[in-house]
């Protein structure tokens, strides 16, 4: 459940908007392509990890197999992504916590208090143990499934096939010209790679069990993403997405626009609850990966003293940044996907290639495929980097409804 919780973040709510250019059939292809590539790269990391002691993370593997230069590049990319995501989750989760507490007590609660409450409870879980994170995440995932079904069950049943499978692009154009803007968002929807080493440690080196959890967690996410696409793109016509795109996929605007074509009821409140649980599970998964990554770098053990030092370096920088600069890093967040592609696409393929030459296949696990899979994942990384750069420079078509 740690993998499913990490992958299924509140960002998935924006997937129908990000893929509105390629629409439903195109989004299925992009989601399947991204799911397979990201799962494969995660399994590559797992195989490489079997050659190292339990607890060894990216720092140990990249330094040993690719050298100090690549280790610096990878380390900066990993730290940038995980710290920035932690910052973002504290900010958004704290805001929702403050509003929830304020509504419950009938008063106004400051953002700072909300952030400290949200952070304190979840950070304690990560400091305590991966087992507690797993159990808490399982509860939250159950709540997410219930709220998701509650919010979208009727919409999925009422989905209209002519709307869902709309393929009438304007004359002389194609839906596929918008694929570059869809790829980076879908990649961000399948990020779990920082947790592979944590899971191998949690399962005491049982790599096949870790592989099963990666398959199960990412498949759960894929199914939920496809159902969400059906719920939205099966009811809201492609030609009516302009206000949603202008609002950058904001959930309230999406629901308001959708309500003109379908019964939405209390969907906004239910999706807010879903978002809150999704943010909490993502926070737990991301920070657990960051926690073990930092412990590996400094070789701090699992004693109370060691875990406390690791927790301090894991949580204090993003917490202090969030309290001092509650609206900062907005521009930097746009580059999270670019940095993540380095260590979720390019680095895993390089690691497996060097690992196979140095050690042979994994000790008790071998990822499917061979050299062709390494090339596939490496090219997946290159394609996503190109797509993100071209999209941010506005050198590719952008669908605006």
Q: What role is predicted for each listed range?
A:
Residues 327-401:
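A generic transmembrane alpha-helix motif of multi-pass inner-membrane proteins
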Residues 145-154, 277-289, 313-317, 336-362:
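Hydrophobic alpha-helical segments of multi-pass membrane transport proteins
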Residues 56-68, 221-279, 300:
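TM-loop-TM module centered on a large, flexible mid-protein loop between adjacent transmembrane helices
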Residues 108-117, 206, 216-224, 233, ...:
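Loop-to-transmembrane helix boundary motifs in multi-pass membrane proteins
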Residues 16-47, 59, 220, 399-401:
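Extracellular loop-to-transmembrane helix junctions
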Residues 1-7, 76, 100-129, 144-151, ...:
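Transmembrane alpha-helical segments of multi-pass small-molecule transport proteins
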Residues 108-117, 129-131, 135-249, 253-256, ...:
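Helix-loop-helix junctions that connect adjacent transmembrane segments
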Residues 40-106, 272-296:
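Hydrophobic transmembrane alpha-helices that form the core helical bundles
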């Amino acid at each position: 459940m740690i993998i499913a919780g990490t992958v299924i973040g509140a960002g998935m709510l924006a997937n129908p908007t990000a893929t509105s250019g390629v629409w439903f059939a195109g989004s299925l292809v992009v989601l399947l392509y991204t799911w397979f590539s990201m799962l494969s790269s995660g399994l590559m990391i797992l195989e490489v990890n079997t050659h190292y002691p339990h607890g060894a993370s990216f720092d140990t593997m990249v330094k040993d197999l690719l050298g100090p230069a690549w280790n610096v590049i990878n380390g900066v990319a990993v730290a940038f992504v995980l710290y920035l995501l932690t910052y973002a989750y504290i900010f958004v989760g704290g805001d929702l916590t403050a509003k929830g507490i304020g509504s419950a007590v009938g008063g106004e609660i400051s953002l700072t208090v909300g952030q400290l409450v949200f952070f304190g409870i979840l950070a304690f879980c990560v400091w305590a143990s991966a087992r507690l994170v797993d159990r808490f995440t399982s509860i939250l995932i159950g709540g997410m499934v219930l709220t998701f079904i509650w919010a979208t069950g009727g919409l999925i049943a009422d989905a209209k096939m002519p709307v869902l499978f709309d393929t009438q692009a304007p004359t002389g154009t194609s839906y596929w010209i918008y694929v570059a803007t869809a790829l980076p968002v879908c990649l961000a929807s399948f990020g779990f790679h920082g947790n592979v080493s944590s899971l191998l440690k949690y399962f005491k080196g049982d790599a096949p069990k870790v592989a099963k959890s990666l398959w199960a967690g990412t498949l759960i996410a894929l199914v939920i993403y496809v159902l969400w696409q059906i719920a939205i793109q099966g009811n809201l016509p492609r030609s009516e997405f302009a206000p949603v795109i202008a609002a950058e996929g904001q959930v309230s605007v999406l629901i308001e626009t959708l309500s003109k074509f379908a019964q939405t009821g209390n969907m906004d409140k239910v999706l807010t609850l879903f978002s809150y649980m999704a943010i909490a599970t993502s926070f737990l998964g991301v920070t657990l990966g960051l926690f073990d990554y930092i412990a590996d770098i400094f070789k701090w053990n699992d004693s109370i003293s060691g875990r406390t030092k690791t927790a301090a370096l894991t949580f204090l920088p993003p917490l202090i940044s969030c309290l001092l600069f509650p609206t900062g890093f907005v521009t930097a967040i746009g580059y999270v996907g670019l940095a993540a592609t380095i260590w979720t696409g390019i680095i895993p393929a390089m690691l497996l290639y060097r690992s196979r030459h140095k050690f042979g296949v994994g000790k008790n696990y071998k990822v499917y495929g061979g050299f062709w899979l390494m090339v596939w994942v490496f090219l997946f990384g290159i394609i996503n980097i190109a797509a993100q750069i071209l999209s941010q420079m506005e050198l590719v078509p952008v669908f605006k409804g």
